[in-house]
Amino acid sequence: MFAILTGIPDAQLFKFSTRIPEALDQHTIVNDFKGYEKFYFLGGSPSFNNFEGILKNINGLQMHTEGSFSEQPINVWGISDKDLYLEANKVFKKQTKPFFAYIQTAGNHHPYDKSIAPEDTDFVKIDKEKAVLKNYGFRNEAEFNAFRYSDYCIQKFMEAAKKESYFTNTIFVFVGDHGVAGNATEMYPEVWTQQSLTNEHVPLLFYAPTLLKAEKREEVVSQIDILPTIAGLAHISYTNTTLGRDLLDTNKRNDFAFITSTTGTIGMVTDSFYFVRNINFPDEQLFTMRNDIKVTPEQSDSIKKALSAFTSAYFETAKYLIMNNKKGK
């Protein structure tokens, strides 16, 4: 959430920036959506990780969270994702003005065996052999089916939304908050598994069938790029004070993502390379992201040096912005 709303990577490493009082005053592009109603939906409590602290930066935000719904919680995270989506749809279909909404789901988290609402009997669990699950990064059937249930909930949301007038003029954006450390060797080179890059790898889908043509793109992007891209698609004039970029602006093509780990590493992922540094002791490594990339030792040293400098500069800039990207008056 912090990265999406502020355009700054959460570079604190060992503590969420939303838990740091000095980091809560943040400028966000959401406030440039003038004349838009603004909504936030969460099936549980916004006090978790102090989500509500960062959300206070959004002017006129209408919160729909724990205690707002007639449905009963199914686990510690609150009501089911399906119910949350359908509650949001009830609000959206009543709107007469443009709106910006953030729906934060939580079903694809532990406890996986409690993620699926009992009343959703049309969702059929699938049994898979442990070896097959492991080959594709899943630890057990509960995790696999919770992942599938996320798709089911999105399907129910889209089916409901398509019946309403707002659907044809709305840009839906789906993104994961983080991935899962698992075996990815069936789909990606070994480095993805060895370096736990699956932890950082999430889908990003822009869906607006009446506004956007269908295409699949492979470049490296990150959560900080989402708001500038949405604003660009909506033709909103906005002030960008941080590090995100409009992914559809062909004049700003420089594909990379800065990533951090609670193990004490920072790194930079490009379309071709992954550079990683351990900040606890002097260790830097460079990996190729694809099996077809071949470099000489001299080329590797040059690339590592360049990415090392870039990573250092980006890390320090992100830390500065976390404390200095003030909302203003």
Across the structure, where does each feature detected by a protein language model lie?
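Solvent-exposed soluble domains appended to multi-pass membrane proteins
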Residues: M1-K329
